Amino acid sequence: MKRLFSGDFAHKVGYSLISVVIFAIFFAGMIFLTNPTGTILDTGWTLETAEDIRAVTLPYTEDVDEKVTRTYRVTFPYVDADTLVIPRPSANAMLVFLNGQQVYSTGNIRQPTANIWNMLHLVSLPVNLMREENVLEIVLGRDNTIGLQVYPFLASRQEVFLKISLANWLSSDFLLIAIGAALMIGVFLIRLSRTFKHRQSPEVFMGHAAILSAIYCFDF
């Protein structure tokens, strides 16, 4: 029993537990950072397509096989907020209108190819456009699964800016750093395996796994 929990085995168990704890912290952090706050726009949505206008309940997505645009529209009363947060829309281009005035755009709505679906978008709402009753329109463009998977919400920029910025860093910039690190580690392990007599060493498989994982993550 002492041998079982000593030496290299104990170290491996310790490293495994540390990895699980780190993963749990990041996972819980992402849930906390992306949790809607403030005034959540969870009811009253309509969807306008080229064929009709119909009421929908968020989250709502649909699968398409050609480039389309979808307009999500909701009416809300005046609230003390200056920022709209749109979490990870299923789209490659987006326009936002408040009371008929464009207040935000990202990607090319005619040729939607931008990677905007893994970001939480902060949209500034000009105070002079706010009324007692406000109409918000979110226009999405894409050629596959399209829609809103998370409720947009209204909040004070001061309250959400740091949280949203950190969430975007973890889901975008941090991922790029991890991809670069995985590529470097993969190349290093493959080169290291060539110094051993046995070509089929664990390092060569770990190196290829790291490189393939980095390539897969490029999709995000």
Features from the language model and the residues they span:
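Membrane-water interface of alpha-helical transmembrane segments
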Residues: F5-Y15, F174, F196-E203
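Short, aromatic-rich amphipathic segments at membrane interfaces
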Residues: V150-D173
